[in-house]
Amino acid sequence: MPASVLAEIRFEPACLFQVVQGNLLEEPVEAIVNAANGMLAHGGGVAGILSRAAGPELQEESDRIVHERGPFPTGSAVVTTAGKLPFKGVIHAVGPRYGEGAEEEKLEQALRAAFACARERGWRSVSFPAVSSGIFAVPLEICSRAYLRSVRDAKLENVRLCLRDAPVVEAVLAEVARQGKA
């Protein structure tokens, strides 16, 4: 079932930001963003769902990258193939955990790094989940502000924030309304 578009904002130059409710694995984009940890161990949350759908090659490639380069710091992003998924790649954004400090800035940094990975590969459309809001427990108000600020300078044609859970949807839509752009 296609995602429901809940809000749209047009950022200059020509970036359409859409807040949608649906399944990240079915998004009509070139690449999706994964909510990752620094070890790229995709066991739980969005990462676990994505990894199981992609097949073992996604985790194997992630393990190889971490073995060669070491753990990734909070605020960074790295690209892997998408395995069995219908995307050109998966961008793994390492968001902050609540309590480590400067969560809002680190979350913005992780998403900006993810969008930069997409631009470097010539990808024009990406969809990202509610990074850091689940098992990393960053408060939804902080996440919502970071999501909107990071997209403003994404320099991509279409950026979609794909959400599932009602509390996250409500928090993001409230932030969109606060910014007066819905």
Each language-model region and where it sits:
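Phosphate/ribose-phosphate-bearing ligand recognition and processing surfaces
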Residues: 96-182
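Glycine-/small-residue-enriched capping loops at alpha/beta junctions
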Residues: 2-120
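Polar low-complexity intrinsically disordered regions
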Residues: 1-3, 181-182
